[in-house]
């Protein structure tokens, strides 16, 4: 993990006709900057800084958003056009003379693309596919990497190199008229060549790499001149001055030449003169580490001096240290000392900047120190900059001389919300009550999507935020990340934990509820037979609990899961009630949505505190906890939802029978009240603060047949009195935000049911609304958010797609978006996990 610019310069430069073209920025909503500079003067020829914000069709059909181009890959200039690689999508084309937009077929070719481009005047290739340069229309797909070989085309195909030439061809248009067009036809092929990774043409030679092999082919003689192995996968090939350069994913660069060499040229590792241990700084580092308790994460050394404190902190801890110094002389000195110590660039970096305006990301530092302060040097750092840089929930400022160290530990952000359960809390409000984050949004951090997660149609568990930790469940592990800087803190291996969710059924947690929650200092995660208690801070296992036996005395299986104030709540799942997949198909036996028994355990010991055995069945979505009570609907399970349900010809569909709402004492399990008149709902949500219990449906895309929708009712939590009951149209799971119920389709006063103004619109996107006090998040082609606090409009954060249920949450004063796009073939520009903050 490293700090980089919000606008990384990934648009590799191209030079043509005395002009250099380059680009910066990968997130369209942050702005993409494409620039042309004159080589002789360095003056700007043109700048395109608007097409990142372009409102346009997105990769998924029917999806439009304010999300335009990105800059990711080597640019190509050819015949009056600049081709801009956009990462995972097809290239955009600009006019090379003025930078004006020509085309970007993001939706039309929504499952094509990549960063590799080869220009041929009237045509270009992108990741093996031939396109017409005039209009960007696709013509033909080749099987592997493509390179230019003079006027011809070379491509890797089925174990060899296939060379093509241009040819005039004919075809019939849609009206049957014969038309001429320029295409390609095979010229010659050579087999037995490694390939498939990268391919370039150099004069009459073709260079191909495949895995750890590289080969050079003489196109004139159509022979393999030589091939060799390298260490790692050979991703980069380049030729210049009669030499071939090969770079691998293991960090090696090889140079090959046709000239005879006396021997292999290597540069021996430089012997480093390690600075001696300076007692003052060694003692200071020891005191800082012991008093702060911070030994991992990001450390900022504001006013680092000559880097001595940074050297000692690096020696005594696992911190990654960023030094800031205003004095250019000290910057140079610190860099040299750190380089001599073998630490520069790997463990420690030095930047020159104002100590009061570092331009580093907000909330970055787990630890803030000052090397100059160790010896009593003057260091003036504004309090607001110190606060801005320090991570909430435990970030530490430790500045001063040995023995006079001032320690300042940052707590939670005032007004920050939490997201501890699937729908924010055990009350199912779908609202974190975060009062800090609001639009407009901008990037705080991003990282590779390196935790394998269930494919998006599997609707895996929502991410959680608790006490500064982002907890995400993957296919084979649960991971805790520092929510404020994206650093992995721990990972607990659970092979196959979400295997059942890695399918195209579009059910998942929409029916089962989550198997993951947090409470206090614990993470709870159930794996059918047992529930693990894991330490939130360390990832260490603290306990393992089995559910109680069924009424029949058989071993129980975990279904629903929640934790509140040290108590663990769960259900014994009904393994006979198996719902039908909502999309293509799925193995559903491990995706259970109904239970026969509700119970409570001690959250530390696992001791059974009480149980409620249902008269009929308890739907997992129809459980809400808060205000010292457990609310649930005891109702016959809906037969029409199941795989085995078959309706006889002419038979009326079996309705979902009504049931009863019960309020149970959360401590004892005793029934406080029960209402059994006209109980129609399939979900419950609770506002404990307002003493309101909402009953409704989850009438979303790919719903179960029993989710008929069209109605809501509200009960008073003290006695079950029905406050109001209305027929209303909505198309998402309801969200409770203070005094208002929000859903796609409308908003209603929580206490009266009266309509409230809510002009909500979004583009294509399944999934539900996840809100804070000031905004709500959802999929709207890309990531969408609705500004509740100010404009009452929908906006996009572009360049990525959300999952198909809940994976973007407003909590901790920020927006957290771990990747949930696995399995999607649509060429959204970026696939990453990230956090957003309110733009200043």
Would you name each region that the model predicts?
Residues 1-3, 46-68, 106-113, 176-186, ...:
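Surface-exposed loop and turn segments in beta-propeller and other repeat-based domains
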Residues 4-35, 60-91, 105, 109-130, ...:
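Repeat-blade elements of multi-bladed beta-propeller folds
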Residues 333-360:
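S-adenosyl-L-methionine
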Residues 33-43, 93, 99, 486, ...:
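Beta-propeller blade signature
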Residues 379-395:
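A short glycine-rich, Lys/Arg-flanked "PGG" loop and its adjoining helix->strand segment in the class I
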Residues 2-3, 50-51, 135-136, 142-307, ...:
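Extracellular/periplasmic ectodomains of large secreted or surface enzymes and adhesion receptors
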Residues 320-325:
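Conserved SAM-binding motif I beta-strand of class I
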Residues 39-41, 95-98, 133-136, 167-168, ...:
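Short loop/turn segments that connect beta-strands within beta-propeller blades
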């Amino acid at each position: 993990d490293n700090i980089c610019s919000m606008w990384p310069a990934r648009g590799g430069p191209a030079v043509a006709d005395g002009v250099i073209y380059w680009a910066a920025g990968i997130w369209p909503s942050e702005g993409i900057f494409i620039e042309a500079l004159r080589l002789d003067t360095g003056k700007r020829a043109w700048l395109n800084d608007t097409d990142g914000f372009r409102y346009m069709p997105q990769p998924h059909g029917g999806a439009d958003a304010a999300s335009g181009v990105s800059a990711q890959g080597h640019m190509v200039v050819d015949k009056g056009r600049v081709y801009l690689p956009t990462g995972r999508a097809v290239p955009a084309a600009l006019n090379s003379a003025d930078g004006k937009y020509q085309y970007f077929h993001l939706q039309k070719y929504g499952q094509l693309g990549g960063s590799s481009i080869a220009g041929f005047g009237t045509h270009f290739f992108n990741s093996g596919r031939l396109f017409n340069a005039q209009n960007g229309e696709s013509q033909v797909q080749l099987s592997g990497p493509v390179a230019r070989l003079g006027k011809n085309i070379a491509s890797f195909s089925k174990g060899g190199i296939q060379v093509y030439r241009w040819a005039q061809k004919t075809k019939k248009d849609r009206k049957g008229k014969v038309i001429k067009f320029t295409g390609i036809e095979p010229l010659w092929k050579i087999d037995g060549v490694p390939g498939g990774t990268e391919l370039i043409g150099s004069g009459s030679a073709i260079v191909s790499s495949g895995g750890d092999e590289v080969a050079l082919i003489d196109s004139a003689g159509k022979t393999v001149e030589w091939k060799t192995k390298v260490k790692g996968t050979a991703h980069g090939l380049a030729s210049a001055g009669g030499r071939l350069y090969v770079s691998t994913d293991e960090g090696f660069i090889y140079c090959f030449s046709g000239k005879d060499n006396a021997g292999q040229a290597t540069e021996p590792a430089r012997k480093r003169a390690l600075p001696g241990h300076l007692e003052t700084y060694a003692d200071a580092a020891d005191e800082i580490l012991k008093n702060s308790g911070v030994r991992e994460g990001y450390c900022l050394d504001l006013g680092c001096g000559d880097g001595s404190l940074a050297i000692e902190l690096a020696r005594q801890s696992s911190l990654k240290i960023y030094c800031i110094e205003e004095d250019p002389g000290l910057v140079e000195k610190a860099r040299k000392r750190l380089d001599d110590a073998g630490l520069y660039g790997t463990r420690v970096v030095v930047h020159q900047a104002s100590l009061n305006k570092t331009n580093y990301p907000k909330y970055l530092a787990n630890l803030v120190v000052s090397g100059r302060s160790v010896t009593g040097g003057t260091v003036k750092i504004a309090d607001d900059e110190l606060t801005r840089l320090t991570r909430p929930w435990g970030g530490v400022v430790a500045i001063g001389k040995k023995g006079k160290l001032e320690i300042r530990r940052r707590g939670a952000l005032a007004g920050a919300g939490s997201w501890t359960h699937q729908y924010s809390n055990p009350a199912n409000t779908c609202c974190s009550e975060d009062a800090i984050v609001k639009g407009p949004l901008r990037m705080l951090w991003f990282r590779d999507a390196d935790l394998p997660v269930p494919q998006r149609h599997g609707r895996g568990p929502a991410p959680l935020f608790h006490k500064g930790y982002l907890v995400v469940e993957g296919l084979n592990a649960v991971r805790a990340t520092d929510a404020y800087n994206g650093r992995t803190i721990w990972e607990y291996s659970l092979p196959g934990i979400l295997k059942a969710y890695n399918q195209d059924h579009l059910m998942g947690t929409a029916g089962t509820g989550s198997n993951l929650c947090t409470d206090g200092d614990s993470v709870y995660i159930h794996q059918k037979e047992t529930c693990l208690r894991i330490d939130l801070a360390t990832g260490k296992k603290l306990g393992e609990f089995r559910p109680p036996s069924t009424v029949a005395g058989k071993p129980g299986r975990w279904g629903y899961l929640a934790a509140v104030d040290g108590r663990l709540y769960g259900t014994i799942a009904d393994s006979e009630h198996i719902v039908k997949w909502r999309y293509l198909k799925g193995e559903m036996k491990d995706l259970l949505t109904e239970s026969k028994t509700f119970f409570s355990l001690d959250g530390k010991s696992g001791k059974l505190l009480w149980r409620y055995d249902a008269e009929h069945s308890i739907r997992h979505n129809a459980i809400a906890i808060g205000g010292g009570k457990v609310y649930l609907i005891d109702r016959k399970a809906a037969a029409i939802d199941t795989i085995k349900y078959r309706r006889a010809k002419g038979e009326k569909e079996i309705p979902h029978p009504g049931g009863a709402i019960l309020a149970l004492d959360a401590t004892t399990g005793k029934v406080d009240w029960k209402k059994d008149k006209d109980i129609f709902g399939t979900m419950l949500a609770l506002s404990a603060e307002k003493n309101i219990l909402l009953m409704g449906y989850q009438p979303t895309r790919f719903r179960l047949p029993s989710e008929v929708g069209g109605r809501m009712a509200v009960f008073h939590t003290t006695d079950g009195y029905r406050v109001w009951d209305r027929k209303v149209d909505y198309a998402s799971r309801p969200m409770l935000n203070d005094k208002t119920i929000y859903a796609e389709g409308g908003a209603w006063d929580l206490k009266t049911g009266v309509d409230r103004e809510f002009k909500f619109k979004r583009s294509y996107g399944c999934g539900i609304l996840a809100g804070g006090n000031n905004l709500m998040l959802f999929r709207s082609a890309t990531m969408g958010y609705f500004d509740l606090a100010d404009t009452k409009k929908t906006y996009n954060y572009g360049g990525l797609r959300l999952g198909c249920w809940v994976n973007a949450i407003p909590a901790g004063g920020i927006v957290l978006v771990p990747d949930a796009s696995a399995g999607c073939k649509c060429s959204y520009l970026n696939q990453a996990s990230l956090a957003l903050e309110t733009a200043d």
